């Protein structure tokens, strides 16, 4: 089990990092502006939640990386006993998630004991690290407001490639991602087809060296680590689990240097399963 960062350690470095304001406003921070996400997948969430009568001990909130858990063998292997609920939507930024859990009412009928949040990578092209961290904080605060007893695991934003820096050209990556994104946009994606598309990308393996990874992500993670209070909110950065011994990002784990392969999802599951168990037990004792 990977150790959760103690609150004391987080406090010790708090003076060295930017401060998250108590109340982030959309006028001051575009990453907390709620972005309408009234699309078929969101509507499907509401139907499934209603049909299951809100069943589920843990919810996963995020973007296409979380969305991609669907159809993965590792999903049931690692989390099946928790009756997990996948609330990931491809292309989501922090503002989309904020809309979904407020105006979109995705949490209304759910009674989760724990939540896993991994969001922010889609903000990196337009927002600062401070703004993105503010968006993540706003999601955490909204979760706490709606579900006072919930325990929250905030994951550091996963490492990813920068622009124009992979061994494969950006044209290759873009062309490989297009059909994946198109399939994910469908109300009911064809999982077999998605897996075939990912395998095609996996055949073009390469590694992005550490020096060429997106530089904004470590900055975001430094700031959101401060959200860990050791009681309700816990922070964990599992980014190193996806890297090789030199800190590079292998294509066999992230075929397009952003989305995970089946191996990548297994790594993710192994890295947080024990943490989820711990958070659910904490909730049960209260």
Identify what each model region corresponds to.
Residues 28-36, 86-96, 257:
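Acidic/histidine-rich helix-loop elements
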Residues 67-83, 94-169, 206-207:
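Oxyanion-hole/transition-state-stabilizing segment in secreted/luminal serine hydrolases
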């Amino acid at each position: 089990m990977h150790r959760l960062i103690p609150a004391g350690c987080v406090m010790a470095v708090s003076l060295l990092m930017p401060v998250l304001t108590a109340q982030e406003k959309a006028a001051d921070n575009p990453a907390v502006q709620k972005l309408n996400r009234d699309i078929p997948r969101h509507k499907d969430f509401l139907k499934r939640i209603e049909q299951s009568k809100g069943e589920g001990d843990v919810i996963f909130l995020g973007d296409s990386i979380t969305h991609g858990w669907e159809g993965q063998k590792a999903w049931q292997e690692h989390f099946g006993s928790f009756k997990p609920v996948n609330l990931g939507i491809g292309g989501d930024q922090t503002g989309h998630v904020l809309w979904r859990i407020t105006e979109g009412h995705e949490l209304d009928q759910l009674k989760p004991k724990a939540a896993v949040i991994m969001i922010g990578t889609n903000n990196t092209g337009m927002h600062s690290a401070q703004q993105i961290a503010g968006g993540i904080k706003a999601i955490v605060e909204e979760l706490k407001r709606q579900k006072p007893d919930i325990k929250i695991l905030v994951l550091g934003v996963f490492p990813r490639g920068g622009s124009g820096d992979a061994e494969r050209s950006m044209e290759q990556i873009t062309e490989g991602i297009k059909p994946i994104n198109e399939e994910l946009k469908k109300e009911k994606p064809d999982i077999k087809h998605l897996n075939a598309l990912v395998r095609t990308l996996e055949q073009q393996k390469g590694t992005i060296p550490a020096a060429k990874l997106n530089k904004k992500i470590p900055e975001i993670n430094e700031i959101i680590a401060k959200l860990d209070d050791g009681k309700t909110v816990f922070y964990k950065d599992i980014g190193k689990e996806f890297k090789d011994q030199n800190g590079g990002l292998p294509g066999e784990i992230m075929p397009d240097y952003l989305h995970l392969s089946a191996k990548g999802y297994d790594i993710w599951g192994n890295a947080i399963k024990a943490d989820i168990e711990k958070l659910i037990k904490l909730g049960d004792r209260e």
